């Protein structure tokens, strides 16, 4: 049974309190939640109202949650407040780790739990808007979302196959089922009295329009939180991203903030101001910067790249230090193109962005092989070059855009440290010193579940690198090849003994560039692209 919408009077969109709005959510509804980490486009007031209502009344019950992008703060925000037994029975997320209380329910087998690649998930919502049954893609082949492996299922109570193997013209693809949502929680900055909405204070658009269309076209209720409402037909048409006829309920929250923390709107990350070139932004010389510096060596002039969250995200700052940041374009899967990537939970809140696409279109570009290079952080690597990030140490993190990005990028640069768990290093006199070794080996013999398939990458002719603070590897048909080591480390003691398998040692094994280890600009000149 579809939810009942409140009526419009004289064309005006109903304006309700958040508490009144969530009363329209019936039991068993499928709720799709917009938002990214750090409070980006998160309808926090609506989420809080729903969580509070369930605490007080134990209704609505047995909701299904769809969350394409990881929203939250890696603690108690995002969709974590909805992690109440009986409120949620089923979840399909692109990323799980930003709202860990939902992940906890999945790990404890208390909810049915699926993970689609983030880009695939937003594309299935677009398919749901068009009343298409799903999408067909080769994104995810050879990884844990492949039905020949785990099929995107995250725990033992998740049984139904949402992903199927299909064949067209003798080519294998994955079919991802589209799930049509009944309720949407979306957010904008301003709307008029008919629901037409603009995003002037926001840092991106994500897939707000796709979600609204999917819910509207399937007879559901689109609930939109905004900071203010204005007279009808007074918003500039080129600024309107959500047409009013898609919106069923508006919740006005004058205290709505751009990001978590309640700070005033940052006009640099909203794209209104441009940071002057003289503004100093730099990283201290540590293992994080060391990896970012070495990763920059894989960039070429004119390239279009992607940078992911984690240790890889310092590459933009390093390029700015070296004066070559304008010689290539870095993108983020959530939509930003160009500029300086932010770090931490609000990843994607870029400064000096050149353009912002909707997230679904950004992933179309990625899936089609548009990226020349990508920089992604890794959790674990095995002897076949497979990489794991979506689940480790028993914790469900989810893939985010990792699978979408790494599947077709012409060059893939994985960034991380060789070990984890209290690793401490220092860089002195142009050398790397391991002060305290990490407790956990990250290069293991076999991955239990695969987020990136080395085999598929080789079949597609992709160039794969693994960059750590003390060693650089490349992927070939016979496995990982060690091609560089840091000055100051011992090959056997500091590298080979800290891996569960022995890589092929390149006969041309060399030291990593000495400039990486000096606390001054490297004088790096970006190479021309090969033709």
Language-model segment annotations:
Residues 2-5, 9-23, 38-54, 66, ...:
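Conserved phosphate- and dinucleotide-binding cores of soluble alpha/beta proteins
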Residues 22, 61, 281-284, 293-300, ...:
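Glycine-rich phosphate/ribose-binding loops and adjacent secondary-structure elements
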Residues 36, 189, 309-311:
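Short, well-ordered beta-to-alpha junction loops that form the rim of enzyme active sites
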Residues 31-33, 304-308:
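Short glycine-rich phosphate-binding loop at a beta-alpha junction
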Residues 50-63, 328:
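Beta-solenoid repeat scaffold
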Residues 196, 274-287, 294-306, 479-480, ...:
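Glycine-rich phosphate/diphosphate-binding loops and the adjacent beta-loop-alpha structural elements
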């Amino acid at each position: 049974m579809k939810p009942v919408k409140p009526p419009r009077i004289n064309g005006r969109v109903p304006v309700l309190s958040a508490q009144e709005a969530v009363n329209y959510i019936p039991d068993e509804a499928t709720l799709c939640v917009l938002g990214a980490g750090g409070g980006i486009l998160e309808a926090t007031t609506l989420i809080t109202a729903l969580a509070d209502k369930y605490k007080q009344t134990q209704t609505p019950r047995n909701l299904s949650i769809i969350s394409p992008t990881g929203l939250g703060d890696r603690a108690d925000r995002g969709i974590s407040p909805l992690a109440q037994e009986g409120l949620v029975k089923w979840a399909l997320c692109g990323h799980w780790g930003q709202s860990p209380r939902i992940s906890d329910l999945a790990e404890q087998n208390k909810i049915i739990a699926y993970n689609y690649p983030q880009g695939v998930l937003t594309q299935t919502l677009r398919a749901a808007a068009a009343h298409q049954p799903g999408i067909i893609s080769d994104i995810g082949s050879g990884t844990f979302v492949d039905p020949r492996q785990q099929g995107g299922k995250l725990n033992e109570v998740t049984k139904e196959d949402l992903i199927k193997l299909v064949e067209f013209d003798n080519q294998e693809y994955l079919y991802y089922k589209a799930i049509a949502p009944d309720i949407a929680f979306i957010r904008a900055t301003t709307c008029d009295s008919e629901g037409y909405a603009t995003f002037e204070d926001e840092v991106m658009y994500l897939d707000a329009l796709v979600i609204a269309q999917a819910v509207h076209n399937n007879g559901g209720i689109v609930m939109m939180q905004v900071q203010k409402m204005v007279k009808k037909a007074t918003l500039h048409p080129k600024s309107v991203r959500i047409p009013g006829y898609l919106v069923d309920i508006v919740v006005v929250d004058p205290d709505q903030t751009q990001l978590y923390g309640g700070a005033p709107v940052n006009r640099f990350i909203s794209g209104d101001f441009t940071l002057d070139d003289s503004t100093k932004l730099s990283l201290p010389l540590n293992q994080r910067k060391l990896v970012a510096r070495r990763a920059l060596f894989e960039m070429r002039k004119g390239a279009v790249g992607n940078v992911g969250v984690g240790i890889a995200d310092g590459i933009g700052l390093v390029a700015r230090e070296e004066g070559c940041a304008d010689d290539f374009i870095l993108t983020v899967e959530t939509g930003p193109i160009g500029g300086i990537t932010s770090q931490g939970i609000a990843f994607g809140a870029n400064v000096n962005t050149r353009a912002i696409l909707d997230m679904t279109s950004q992933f179309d570009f990625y899936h089609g092989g548009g990226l020349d290079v990508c920089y992604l952080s890794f959790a674990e690597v095995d002897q076949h070059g497979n990489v794991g990030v979506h689940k480790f140490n028993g914790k469900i993190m989810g893939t985010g855009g990792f699978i979408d990005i790494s599947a077709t990028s012409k060059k893939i640069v994985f960034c991380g440290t060789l070990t984890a768990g209290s690793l401490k290093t220092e860089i002195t006199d142009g050398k790397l010193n391991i002060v305290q070794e990490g407790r956990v080996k990250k290069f293991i013999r076999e991955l239990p579940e695969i987020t990136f398939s080395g085999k598929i990458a080789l079949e597609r002719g992709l160039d794969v690198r693994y960059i750590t603070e003390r060693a650089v590897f490349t992927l070939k048909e016979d496995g990982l090849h060690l091609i560089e080591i840091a000055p100051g480390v011992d090959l056997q003691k500091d590298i080979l003994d800290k891996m569960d398998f022995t890589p092929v040692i390149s006969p041309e094994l060399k030291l990593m560039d000495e400039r990486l280890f000096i606390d001054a600009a490297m004088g790096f000149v970006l190479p021309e692209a090969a033709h």
